[in-house]
Amino acid sequence: MKETRKDIDFLKTIAIFSVIFYHFFDLLKSNLLSSVTLFEGGFLGVDVFLLISGFLICGSIVSKLNTDSFNLLQFYTRRVTRIYQPLLVFCAIILFIGYFILFPDIYKETGREVANAIIATANFRFANSTGYFDLESLDKVLLHTWYIAITIQFYLICPVILVSLKKIFKTNFNLSVLLFTTLLLITAFV
């Protein structure tokens, strides 16, 4: 059985409630109270989830690489199954219902969004379109798939980097991971 980390559970709880309260108070602001400013940054809870996921996945991979029990194919198979089964069902439902209720031009756009969701490039598509919080974004049923795309991209890249570091720096693997992470953080702020 997996060991639970209370500190990470606490961060997840804060992230969940910050997103929920953000949406709740945003709804109040747009419908009832125009001066409500509580939880304006609550959407950052999504970023916290990305960080937590990255931390946990990298930690798990590093741990398995240290014991030579990491299987890249098995890792990808589990992730693809976990992510793509519900995503494909959701996309099929959206396309089916959309066929009957959407205008043809919006349906075509939705079809393109479905394609981007499936090939994990929705984050690029939506980053180059309307703002996430703009009124036009209300028409984008798959706008939330930017998160799934980033997650998939991370799952594709992270294990390959870690496996490569393990092969290159056999004896100093943990140090190489630390140095790589440090360099990555430095470049993120430059």
Can you annotate each of these PLM segments?
Residues 1-190:
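Membrane-interface helix/loop caps of multi-pass membrane proteins
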